[in-house]
Amino acid sequence: MRTNPTTSRPGVSTIEEKSTGRIDQIIGPVLDVTFPPGKLPYIYNALVVKSRDTDGKQINVTCEVQQLLGNNRVRAVAMSATDGLMRGMEVIDTGAPLSVPVGGATLGRIFNVLGEPVDNLGPVDTSATFPIHRSAPAFIELDTKLSIFETGIKVVDLLAPYRRGGKIGLFGGAGVGKTVLIMELINNIAKAHGGVSVFGGVGERTREGNDLYMEMKESGVINEKNLEESKVALVYGQMNEPPGARMRVGLTALTMAEYFRDVNKQDVLLFIDNIFRFVQAGSEVSALLGRMPSAVGYQPTLSTEMGSLQERITSTKKGSITSIQAVYVPADDLTDPAPATTFAHLDATTVLSRGLASKGIYPAVDPLDSTSTMLQPRIVGNEHYETAQRVKQTLQRYKELQDIIAILGLDELSEEDRLTVARARKIERFLSQPFFVAEVFTGSPGKYVGLAETIRGFQLILSGELDGLPEQAFYLVGNIDEASTKAINLEEENKLKK
């Protein structure tokens, strides 16, 4: 197999002489192209079709070589619609893989899979470009230290901490606060870690992509007046795009993130929404290329494709890419090959609960269902680990008692259980937190809570020192001192009412 020699090297190779071929066959988004003998393009090379259709409209379609068929023919997958293409049209081999702009110029902008801006804000500086197919960092470059990536969000840092350079799965239905949580993480990494974020919209709804962009502008994550002060670059390949674009848009976003890690030496947050759509697009392309399907109709190369993407998301000695991936579980079947392959790569899972959202507890992260491989005494220390376990035990006991409370009421519980319920309700409310990006809607200023402060707060609740405070004092506050202050204010308000 002729694989591209430039795939592990930044930038585009210099093209001495571009070879041209002719379209031989078109089946949907798949093109067969014949080249002169000895002029065959490499696998993953970008091919460009520039012509005019029968109405005289300009055609500009970029494809990616996937197979070498023999008899000087190659099979390529189009990255945009193939409408208007005809047999015999000229195809130019660019001599390099798809390359996209990288660096500060990408911040605050929206790109498609080819790295072209689609936000009508003018051209982007393309002086620095990277090919989207690159090797994962070598073993010797990897950072082997296990360290927590502090987010400033209490429920995440205490109960399901993120690993620096790790991969986190975000599970949640519509309307439970995925977008707000994503925006808060983007905001906090910029403020606390001096990092930037890249958002890859893989096969998502165009409306959702537009809503996210508007909300980011509203909350200040994207600075319209000075784009370079923005904290995020956006890359979209929506549901209406051909499968080739949806399959590669994750790599485009990852490539932009790699530049910030390797060249700018920053901590980067990479969001992929939705990782299932990446697999789904790969499955469509695999069928179009005539490969024999594997289990449940997925591509036989499912693990390889997932691995080549996930292995590039890691910490090096220069910086880190921490990835948060929304995971759609088809028909709620966790044994489906797509989510099952994804789970193998995840370090933590953040599960959003509709029950908590309906109670008005935001972020609606389920403290019992969310998990992390980092929650071990040798990594986080005994104090953190024991506090987290006691919080979980208290909440679990409260969950077990809820049926009894619903039928018989609180009075039928033992003294010990009543105390557990009271503390669990305080913990539940203290796990809520005002977000910076939600200030516009809530009117409450956002709070970033350090890990040490978070642990201290929960230790005080568990020790019983704060049993005398009303539970509403713990709702939507930052650290525990704010809860004490809020309790005093509530008491004064009650006195005034009387």
From Swiss-Prot:
Catalysed reactions listed for this entry = ATP + H2O + 4 H(+)(in) = ADP + phosphate + 5 H(+)(out)
> Which GO BP annotation is one of this protein's?
proton motive force-driven mitochondrial ATP synthesis
The UniProt keywords, alphabetically, are: ATP synthesis, ATP-binding, CF(1), Chloroplast, Hydrogen ion transport, Ion transport, Membrane, Nucleotide-binding, Plastid, Thylakoid, Translocase, Transport
What's the EC number here? 7.1.2.2
Gene3D superfamilies, A to Z: 2.40.10.170, Bovine Mitochondrial F1-atpase, Atp Synthase Beta Chain, Chain D, domain 3, P-loop containing nucleotide triphosphate hydrolases
SMART domains in the record: AAA
- Subcellular locations according to the entry: Plastid, Chloroplast thylakoid membrane
Q: Does the keyword Ion transport apply?
A: yes
Q: Which HAMAP family match?
A: ATP_synth_beta_bact
Q: Which family is it part of? A: Belongs to the ATPase alpha/beta chains family.
What is this protein's record name?
ATP synthase subunit beta, chloroplastic
Phylogenetic placement of the source organism: Eukaryota, Viridiplantae, Streptophyta, Embryophyta, Tracheophyta
